C-alpha cells in the first residue's frame, strides 16, 4: 500500500531523481556538443548545462574548449570554462590552457559529478619534443616540460609547479633519464617542494630488463631520498620473474613513513590454458606481508575457466595487513 508522500512509481517523494542529456554533431575530424545533467530532490533541481568543442584547423593545430553553467543552491560564482589551443605532431606537442572555476561551481555541480577544486583561475602549458638520430651512439632524445600556476578568484596565489625531463635512448640498449620538479603550495602555510630523479635502465623496451633510480629533494618540510631498483627475467619461454625494490628515507619523519618495500611476481605456463601466478609484497613501515597465488585452467577457452586463488594478508592500500588466509574458487562458462 502506498504511503502519503510516495510517488506513483513507488519511490519516496524525497528520493533523488537523475537525468542526463547529450547531443553532439561531428564536423569532419571536429565536433561540437552540449551536455545537461541534473539531480532533482523535493521539487528542486541541482546540476549543470554546458557546451564543448573539439576543433582541428590543420593536421597539427587544434583547439579544445568547454563552458559549463551550474545551478542549484548558489546563484553566483557558478560558471566554469577552459580554452586549450594545441599543436601535435608525431615528434612534438605543445599546448596552453586557461581554466576558470567559480567560487561555488563545485557546490552545485558535485550533485551530478565531481570537481576536485573550484574557486580558481589556472594557467597551464606544456612542451614535448622527440629527436631521432640516424647515426651515432644516441638513438633518441626526448624532452618534456609542464608549467602550471593557479590563483583564487580573489587573486591569491595558491600553487605553481614546473616540471622538466630529459630522456636518452642509446643504441647499445641502455637508457638514461633525468627529471626535476619545483613547486610552491599554499595550505596552512607556504611550502616550497622540489624533487630530482635520475634513472638508468638496460633493455627496457623488452621484458627481460633491469633498471634503477634515485630521487631526492624536499617535500612538505621533510627532506627525502628514494632509491628504486627493478629486474625482469624470463628463465624459460614459459616462465617469468619480476622484482621491485623501494627504499624511502624521510628527515624529519614525524609520521614514521620511512620504509622498505619489496615486490616479487612469478608466472609459470604449463600450457597455453594452464598456468600459475604468484605475488609477494612486504612493506616494513606497516609490517605488511602479502602472498597471493592464482591457478588458472581454461577448460573451454577462451571464456570457460576454473580459477583457484589463495591469499595471505588482506588490507586496503597503505594499511597494515590482517595476516589471515583466504581461499577463492571461480568457475566460468559461456553458453
Task: Describe the residue ranges of each PLM region.
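Conserved hydrophobic/aromatic pocket- or pore-lining residues that grip, position, or stack substrates
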Residues: 23, 53, 200
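Exposed, low-structure sequence patches enriched in small/polar residues
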Residues: 66-69, 73-335
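Short alpha-helical segments and helix-capping/turn motifs at coil-helix boundaries
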Residues: 17-19, 49, 78-81
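Low-complexity, polar/charged sequence tracts that form flexible coils or short amphipathic helices
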Residues: 26, 44-46, 56, 76, ...
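Extended, well-ordered alpha-helical scaffold/bundle regions in very large, multi-domain proteins
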Residues: 43, 53-56, 60-74
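Glycine-rich phosphate/diphosphate-binding loops that line cofactor/substrate pockets in enzymes
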Residues: 24-30, 58, 134-139, 205
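Short loop/turn segments at secondary-structure transitions that flank enzyme active sites
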Residues: 3-6, 29, 40, 59, ...
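A conserved hydrophobic secondary-structure block that centers on an alpha-helix together
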Residues: 1-44
Amino acid at each position: 500500500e502506498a504511503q502519503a508522500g510516495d510517488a506513483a512509481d513507488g519511490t519516496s517523494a524525497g528520493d533523488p531523481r537523475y537525468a542526463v542529456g547529450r547531443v553532439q554533431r561531428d564536423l569532419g575530424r571536429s565536433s561540437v556538443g552540449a551536455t545537461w545533467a541534473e539531480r532533482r530532490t523535493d521539487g528542486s533541481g541541482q546540476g549543470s548545462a554546458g557546451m564543448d568543442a573539439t576543433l582541428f584547423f590543420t593536421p597539427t593545430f587544434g583547439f579544445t574548449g568547454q563552458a559549463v553553467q551550474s545551478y542549484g543552491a548558489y546563484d553566483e560564482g557558478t560558471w566554469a570554462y577552459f580554452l586549450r589551443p594545441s599543436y601535435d605532431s608525431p615528434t612534438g606537442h605543445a599546448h596552453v590552457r586557461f581554466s576558470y572555476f567559480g567560487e561555488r561551481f563545485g557546490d552545485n555541480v558535485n550533485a551530478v559529478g565531481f570537481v576536485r577544486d573550484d574557486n580558481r583561475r589556472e594557467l597551464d602549458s606544456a612542451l614535448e619534443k622527440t629527436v631521432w638520430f640516424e647515426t651515432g651512439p644516441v638513438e633518441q632524445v626526448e624532452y618534456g616540460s609542464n608549467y602550471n600556476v593557479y590563483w583564487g578568484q580573489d587573486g591569491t596565489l595558491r600553487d605553481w609547479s614546473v616540471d622538466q625531463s630529459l630522456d636518452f635512448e642509446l643504441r647499445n640498449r641502455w637508457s638514461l633519464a633525468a627529471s626535476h620538479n619545483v613547486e610552491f603550495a599554499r595550505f596552512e602555510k607556504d611550502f616550497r617542494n622540489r624533487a630530482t630523479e635520475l634513472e638508468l635502465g638496460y633493455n627496457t623496451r623488452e621484458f627481460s630488463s633491469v633498471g634503477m633510480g634515485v630521487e631526492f629533494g624536499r617535500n612538505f618540510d621533510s627532506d627525502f631520498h628514494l632509491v628504486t631498483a627493478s629486474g625482469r627475467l624470463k628463465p624459460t619461454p614459459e616462465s617469468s620473474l619480476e622484482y621491485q625494490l623501494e627504499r624511502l628515507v624521510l628527515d624529519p619523519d614525524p609520521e614514521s613513513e620511512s620504509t622498505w618495500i619489496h615486490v616479487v611476481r612469478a608466472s609459470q605456463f604449463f600450457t597455453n590454458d594452464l598456468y600459475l601466478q604468484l605475488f609477494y609484497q612486504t612493506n616494513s613501515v606497516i609490517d605488511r606481508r602479502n602472498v597471493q597465488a592464482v591457478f588458472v585452467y581454461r577448460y573451454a577457452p577462451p571464456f570457460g575457466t576454473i580459477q583457484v586463488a589463495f591469499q595471505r594478508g588482506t588490507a586496503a592500500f597503505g594499511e597494515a595487513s590482517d595476516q589471515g588466509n583466504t581461499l577463492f574458487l571461480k568457475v566460468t562458462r559461456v553458453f
